[in-house]
Amino acid sequence: MSLDYENDGDLHARLIDEVLSQYPDKTAKRRKKHLGVAKGREALEQGSDALCETGVKSNIKSIPGVMTVRGCAYAGSKGVVWGPIKDMVHISHGPVGCGHYSWSQRRNYYVGLTGVDAFVTMQFTSDFQEKDIVFGGDKKL
């Protein structure tokens, strides 16, 4: 790429449409909000301060049940709180999928003999679902 690069907005818009055409309609509609063509030099020279019309979407809530790049509060807190503790078994009170996702993160690298002084490879979960947490899940314990 050089400094005299020309921004072909029409080409980029067609490429975005081509990518979105591979998704089902509902998914394409949601993803379209996150894709946009950068404005050319002319728009910046005319005083436009935004480089793209789409804006930042990282501060909106995730859709429950959908894996995102950002992860979730559960996986983040598990990694921060339990990540450094390698010499005890962790019991996770949450869904199996959440437990596995948070268990498989890179902060689970460890040094030690599994089952003796390191229990990182073991993932125990009560498989609590939302209804168990709201209405009491003591029978599952």
UniProtKB/Swiss-Prot annotation:
One of its GO terms (molecular function) is iron-sulfur cluster binding. It catalyses: N2 + 8 reduced [2Fe-2S]-[ferredoxin] + 16 ATP + 16 H2O = H2 + 8 oxidized [2Fe-2S]-[ferredoxin] + 2 NH4(+) + 16 ADP + 16 phosphate + 6 H(+). The keyword Nucleotide-binding applies. GO terms for biological process: nitrogen fixation. This is Nitrogenase molybdenum-iron protein alpha chain. Its cofactor is [8Fe-7S] cluster; [7Fe-Mo-9S-C-homocitryl] cluster. It is an enzyme of class 1 (oxidoreductase). The keyword Iron-sulfur applies. Belongs to the NifD/NifK/NifE/NifN family.
